[in-house]
């Protein structure tokens, strides 16, 4: 069973991912952004932890579709150093989500 601490870590990671997708997705990832926001709203809801996990597991796979999902998302910036930093931060947040969700998927 997922702990409340893990829910909060997921929430923080999804918030960071949502900010990056919103800022650097240039409108092409609106569907993914809606799923991320749904994840956050689910975590914040009054539903039972079991119901939350059911939703989080179901929608997790939609985030990493073969085309147009978070696995395809790359942040571009003309400044190579900044681009590398942003993509590293993005990848760290994706790994953070995976490290929590992998035991439940």
Regions found by a protein language model. Give the residues of each.
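Amphipathic alpha-helical binding modules
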Residues: 62-105
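Amphipathic alpha-helical interaction modules
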Residues: 22-71
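Short terminal alpha-helical segments
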Residues: 1-37, 91-105
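Alpha-helix capping and helix-coil boundary motifs
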Residues: 1-2, 9, 28, 45-52, ...
């Amino acid at each position: 069973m997922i702990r409340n601490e893990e829910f909060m870590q997921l929430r923080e990671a999804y918030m960071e991912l949502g900010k990056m997708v919103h800022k650097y997705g240039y409108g092409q990832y609106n569907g993914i952004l809606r799923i991320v926001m749904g994840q956050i709203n689910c975590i914040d809801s009054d539903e039972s932890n079991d119901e939350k996990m059911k939703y989080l597991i179901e929608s997790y796979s939609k985030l990493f579709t073969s085309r147009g999902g978070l696995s395809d998302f790359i942040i571009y910036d003309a400044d190579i150093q900044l681009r590398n930093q942003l993509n590293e931060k993005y990848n760290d947040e994706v790994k953070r989500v995976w490290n929590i969700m992998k035991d439940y998927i």
